[in-house]
């Protein structure tokens, strides 16, 4: 008999939209989740992070930190200081979408613990963040690449989810105390087809099947009463009908631009790094210091291209550093400045109101900043803009596309029919379901789950993270 110990199982249903999940719960398509999780527990939502994209958006769960705090500001990024200092340095730029994915763990700040390092018997299924796992506990370490390549070239992701479920069930043989299991099918079929395509909905239903199998097994083992099951996502997404390739936009306007997969160019003037396809970072490289551009320096480097970009129908907004602790938001509908002071964050429209928040002149701490924006079109906008631009690897200009559009077309195979990554609520708000009640009902961030899991498990919480325990 396995020793009794608290167990946490976190289902990361990549790309799950809360409205789709609620519709499927209401229609009876998710009977196991309804019976075992919702009826005896809680169904709510949480705010993710910016960029809202796979990989960086796993960091709040597994480290309690936002992408900027973790020095990983996107699924692709460039380090200007490294780029200017080392012609052939391996840390000049990164894309975790390809062969550089194994460097994800090495790129994390070593002083910040992962959740795997806080448990005695943690297991992982499909997450690219694996630092701290005991030998043999990364259950898909040897097979993930094979499965993901198979699915990429065949457009068949259901077998990947089925294999993940097999490994999740296998983890129960190892007396686990924490299991992080990614189910990529919802996200992948949404990209390939549509967020509500039947193949996508079938991926939601398979998660329900997995939950039913898991709970039945835990009951047979006598562990169910001591188990916390959390079902959530790293981001939402929206259907995409048109693409504006941001790198091509700059290249066609006379700016020699470096972007993946063509990352070796002589004397590039700019670089574009896309995340989730709805968020892009522009790095201006026509200087030698490697320093981030501030205020008018961004417009001077990009010239008329910046105003032309902002006027395009595909663009929702752009943002850049306005000065120390200040960030400018620009859109066709207006401009605003977010300021960070020792007392908190403010939002001041200077023309129009790009985020639709009105004037927030009284400084707000991080909790109140979330409360003030949670129900808006840009949840947690003040905190997310701040955390991103406080990262030295973040671009000089951050661009978000409007829903229905994205920022990458060249070399994108297969074509994306859904996108995410932006600060819009349909990308930021994710489902949060768990088989417990009585937790703090305040607006939640996915970053809150790191210390929530530790506290529920009877372990010390970690100071200096971007979240607070909910229980």
What is the predicted role of each segment?
Residues 267-440, 446, 450:
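Active-site neighborhoods of enzymes that stabilize oxyanions during catalysis
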Residues 1-42, 52, 465:
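Active-site-proximal N-terminal segment of extracellular/periplasmic enzymes that hydrolyze or transfer
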Residues 12, 45, 121-127, 178-182, ...:
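A structural signal for short, well-ordered beta-strand segments and their strand-loop junctions
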Residues 58-198, 203-206, 328-375, 394, ...:
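His/Asp/Glu-rich, glycine-adjacent segments
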Residues 53-56, 224, 241-245, 250, ...:
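Short, solvent-exposed loop/turn segments at the edges of secondary structure
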Residues 206-251, 328, 398-400, 453:
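Metal-dependent active-site segment of extracytoplasmic phospho-/sulfohydrolases and closely related
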Residues 438-449, 454-471:
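Long, positively charged, glycine-interspersed low-complexity recognition regions
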Residues 24-28, 139-141, 194-198, 243-250, ...:
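Short secondary-structure boundary/capping segments
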């Amino acid at each position: 008999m396995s020793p009794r110990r608290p167990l946490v199982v976190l289902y990361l249903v990549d790309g799950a939209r809360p409205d789709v999940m609620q519709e499927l719960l209401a229609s009876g398509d998710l009977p196991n989740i309804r019976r075992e999780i919702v009826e005896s527990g809680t169904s709510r939502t949480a705010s993710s992070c910016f960029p809202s994209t796979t990989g960086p958006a796993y960091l709040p769960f597994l480290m309690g930190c936002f992408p900027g705090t973790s020095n990983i500001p996107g699924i692709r990024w460039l380090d200007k200081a490294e780029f200017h200092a080392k012609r052939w340095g391996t840390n000049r730029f990164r894309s975790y979408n390809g062969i550089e994915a194994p460097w994800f763990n090495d790129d994390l700040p070593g002083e910040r613990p992962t959740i795997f390092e806080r448990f005695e018997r943690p297991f992982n299924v499909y997450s690219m963040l694996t630092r701290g796992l005991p030998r043999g506990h990364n259950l898909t370490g040897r097979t993930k690449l094979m499965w993901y390549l198979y699915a990429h070239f065949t457009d068949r992701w259901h077998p990947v989810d089925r294999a993940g479920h097999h490994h999740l069930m296998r983890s129960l043989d190892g007396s686990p105390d924490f299991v992080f299991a990614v189910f990529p099918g919802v996200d992948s079929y949404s990209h390939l087809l549509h967020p509500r395509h039947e193949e996508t909905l079938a991926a939601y239903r398979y998660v329900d099947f997995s939950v039913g199998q898991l709970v039945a097994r835990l009951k047979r083992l006598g562990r169910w009463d001591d188990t916390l099951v959390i079902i959530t996502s790293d981001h939402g997404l929206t259907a995409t009908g048109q693409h504006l390739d941001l790198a091509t936009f700059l290249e066609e306007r006379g700016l020699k631009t470096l972007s993946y997969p063509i990352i070796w160019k002589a004397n590039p003037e700019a670089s574009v790094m896309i995340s989730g396809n709805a968020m892009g970072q522009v790095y201006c490289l026509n200087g030698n210091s490697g320093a981030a551009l501030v205020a008018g320096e961004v417009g001077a480097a990009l010239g008329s291209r910046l105003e032309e970009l902002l006027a395009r129908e595909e663009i929702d907004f752009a943002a850049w550093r306005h000065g120390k602790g200040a960030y400018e938001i620009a859109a066709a509908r207006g401009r605003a400045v977010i300021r960070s002071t020792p007392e908190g964050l403010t939002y001041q429209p200077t023309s129009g109101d790009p985020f639709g928040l009105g004037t927030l002149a009284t400084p707000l701490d991080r909790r109140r900043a979330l409360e003030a924006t949670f129900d808006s079109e840009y949840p947690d906008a003040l905190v997310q803009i701040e955390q991103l631009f406080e990262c030295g690897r973040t671009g000089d200009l951050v661009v978000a596309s409007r829903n229905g559009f994205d920022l990458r077309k060249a070399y994108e195979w297969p074509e994306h029919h859904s996108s995410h990554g932006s600060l819009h609520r349909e990308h930021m708000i994710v489902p949060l379901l768990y088989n417990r009640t009585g937790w703090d009902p305040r607006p939640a961030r996915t970053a809150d789950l790191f210390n929530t899991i530790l506290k529920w498990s009877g372990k010390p919480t970690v100071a200096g993270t971007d979240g607070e325990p909910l229980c």
